[in-house]
Amino acid sequence: MRQEAITTASAKRPGRVEPTMGGSTYLKPQDMAWEPTQFDGISIKVLYEDKEKGEMTCFLKWEPGTTLPMHTHPEIEQTFVLEGSFYDHDGICRAGEFVWRRVGSSHETHSDEGAVILAIYRKPNVFQHSAGYVRKAKIVKKTASSPGTIGPQSG
């Protein structure tokens, strides 16, 4: 019935580009399980990922008292807070608020009360380690074959 309505509406507008069937991917995040990441206190639901480009859109759930270690953004990062709040040296972002990070910006992020955020990455973050070296890393799910440690990534 819905397909008939779409086809009928298209026929009424000559010159209109026809939609690509199967060109959209619909998800029900509420039915997806939270997966652990390599960062204690942070779990993830991946909504979209292009591993070749390094792009990712995901929900991240921060437990109260969580800190994401110092890292740099090689591309802009966009974040919308759905629940709770998180903060860094530049300010605090609360439920219903949005923040984006400039290319090359570095920060450590904290959440005292916990948070659920929608994050959009164009490239994986680069994490700085106390030993003074830098490795590219991205948020990954822990699996039996990948215990979730931060390691070099291609790209």
Residue ranges of each PLM-predicted region?
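Residue-level marker of beta-strand positions
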Residues: T67, E97-F98, V116
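Short, charged/polar surface micro-motifs in flexible loops or helix N-caps
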Residues: E52-G54, E63-T67, Y87, S105, ...
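Conserved hydrophobic/aromatic beta-strand scaffold that supports enzyme active sites
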Residues: I44-V46, T57-F59, Q78, F98-W100, ...
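Short histidine-centered beta-strand/loop micro-motifs
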Residues: Y48, C58-L60, P69-H73, D90-G91, ...
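Glycine- and acidic-residue-biased ligand/ion/polar-headgroup-sensing regions
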Residues: E63-T66, T72-H89, A95
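A short, N-terminal "cap"/entry segment at the start of jelly-roll beta-barrel domains
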Residues: M1-G54, R135-G155
